[in-house]
Amino acid sequence: MAAALRRGYKVLRSVSHFECRAQHTKPSLKQEPGLGFSFELTEQQKEFQTIARKFAREEIIPVAPDYDKSGEYPFPLIKRAWELGLINTHIPESCGGLGLGTFDACLITEELAYGCTGVQTAIEANSLGQMPVIIAGNDQQKKKYLGRMTEQPMMCAYCVTEPSAGSDVAGIKTKAEKKGDEYVINGQKMWITNGGKANWYFVLTRSNPDPKVPASKAFTGFIVEADTPGIHIGKKELNMGQRCSDTRGITFEDVRVPKENVLIGEGAGFKIAMGAFDRTRPTVAAGAVGLAQRALDEATKYALDRKTFGKLLVEHQGVSFLLAEMAMKVELARLSYQRAAWEVDSGRRNTYFASIAKAFAGDIANQLATDAVQIFGGYGFNTEYPVEKLMRDAKIYQIYEGTAQIQRLIIAREHIEKYKN
């Protein structure tokens, strides 16, 4: 483990029993004789959860409203998360990282999102940017680009979406042409999280101009240094929610990239880009659950304090039933991301469960944020109270990393295919 990470863990409590090895990061749905599985977390998972929870409640929540209003990038919080080992959790131990599984990353993500999903998204975007390198990079690429992120707080970004190609990834127009030992990239990317803060990018390009070539062979993925000549970073976008997250457009104009920065080889980019989602969609779902849990907690506390018609809100059946519905939804959404994470950590293809988790948790986050505002009444519509921010922040969970509708297409395809086979 990197020295900085060791120092970070000592900040909150002694965790000398942490060995941070992959075999110690099994999901909570572990096999038990006679029962089949258990919901009990390992001691290490409980430690990670405690550290993340303490950080979110004591350091993120107090400043989240200010970051939301200013739109300032939360680098002090990101640096602190890096010191505590709550960022770059997927990076292999061979590159100086913790080598945690998806399940463990989800536990951390839920806690961070409870504090502020804008901060959590800035952190989680690193995992998305890193994932193509983690699953498809060679040893040299991993050590060079992942290793540097364990040495100091550093960001990366996943550059796939374009102005005219969001859900239709196969419709991207950014091109890469091979010229000698280099590739020349030209095109534009849009809505790139960490776009203006990244040290390097994963960039998906069309390397075969023939429209008849299938997507599985037409695209190539590159690692591109952010300071490469020809890269032009656009203005920071002012979004409806998650405002402290850095979202920008990026233009590539005759950007030269060495052939050593190709992941796997020409034509492998589409599979790499899509494969990354199987590992990151569970954590996105976990972020949505963190927001949903916050909405439930805020609504419940308010209903226990606010009186109307001579009694507490919770004493009105309509409100208590609404809280019950909210509680059911958040518990089921949590189980959905845990199942998706458990599947991939167990070495199984989890596309079906990852899409279920992403779609369901994203919808639940929006429903619970709306319900929380309703319970707060007029106060919920005011910026002095936390739930209006939750409602604004929640919407993006139905859009980024695959819209709610795209997830349903994937779920339907996977479901029907099972019956065909």
UniProtKB/Swiss-Prot annotation:
Provide the positions where the record notes the PTM Phosphothreonine: T351
Detail which positions bind FAD. 158-167, 191-193, 306-308, 316-317, 374-378, 402-405
> At what positions is N6-acetyllysine found?
K69, K79, K212, K217, K259, K271, K301
- A single Gene Ontology CC term: mitochondrial matrix
Organism of this sequence: Rattus norvegicus (Rat)
Q: Does the keyword section mention Chaperone?
A: no
Q: Which domain of life is it from?
A: Eukaryota
Its name, as the record gives it, is Medium-chain specific acyl-CoA dehydrogenase, mitochondrial
Which segment is the transit peptide?
1-25
- Keywords assigned by UniProt? Acetylation, FAD, Fatty acid metabolism, Flavoprotein, Lipid metabolism, Mitochondrion, Oxidoreductase, Phosphoprotein, Transit peptide
* Protein family (similarity comment): Belongs to the acyl-CoA dehydrogenase family.
Described function: Medium-chain specific acyl-CoA dehydrogenase is one of the acyl-CoA dehydrogenases that catalyze the first step of mitochondrial fatty acid beta-oxidation, an aerobic process breaking down fatty acids into acetyl-CoA and allowing the production of energy from fats.
Q: Which SUPFAM superfamilies match?
A: Acyl-CoA dehydrogenase C-terminal domain-like, Acyl-CoA dehydrogenase NM domain-like
Q: Which residues bind octanoyl-CoA?
A: S167, S216, D278, R281, R349, T351, E401
Q: In which pathway does it act?
A: Lipid metabolism; mitochondrial fatty acid beta-oxidation
Task: Name the catalytic site residues.
Answer: E401
EC number(s) given by UniProt: 1.3.8.7
Which GO terms fall under molecular function for this chain's record?
Answer: acyl-CoA dehydrogenase activity; flavin adenine dinucleotide binding; identical protein binding; isomerase activity; medium-chain fatty acyl-CoA dehydrogenase activity; protein homodimerization activity
User: How does it get modified after it is made?
Assistant: Acetylated. Could occur at proximity of the cofactor-binding sites and reduce the catalytic activity. Could be deacetylated by SIRT3.
Q: Which reaction does it catalyse?
A: a medium-chain 2,3-saturated fatty acyl-CoA + oxidized [electron-transfer flavoprotein] + H(+) = a medium-chain (2E)-enoyl-CoA + reduced [electron-transfer flavoprotein]; pentanoyl-CoA + oxidized [electron-transfer flavoprotein] + H(+) = (2E)-pentenoyl-CoA + reduced [electron-transfer flavoprotein]; hexanoyl-CoA + oxidized [electron-transfer flavoprotein] + H(+) = (2E)-hexenoyl-CoA + reduced [electron-transfer flavoprotein]; octanoyl-CoA + oxidized [electron-transfer flavoprotein] + H(+) = (2E)-octenoyl-CoA + reduced [electron-transfer flavoprotein]
Q: Which cofactor does it need?
A: FAD
Which residues span the membrane?
none
GO BP: any one term: response to starvation
Locations listed in the record: Mitochondrion matrix
Q: How does it assemble?
A: Homotetramer. Interacts with the heterodimeric electron transfer flavoprotein ETF.
Matching Pfam families = Acyl-CoA_dh_1 (PF00441), Acyl-CoA_dh_M (PF02770), Acyl-CoA_dh_N (PF02771)
N6-succinyllysine found at: K69, K179, K212, K217, K259, K271
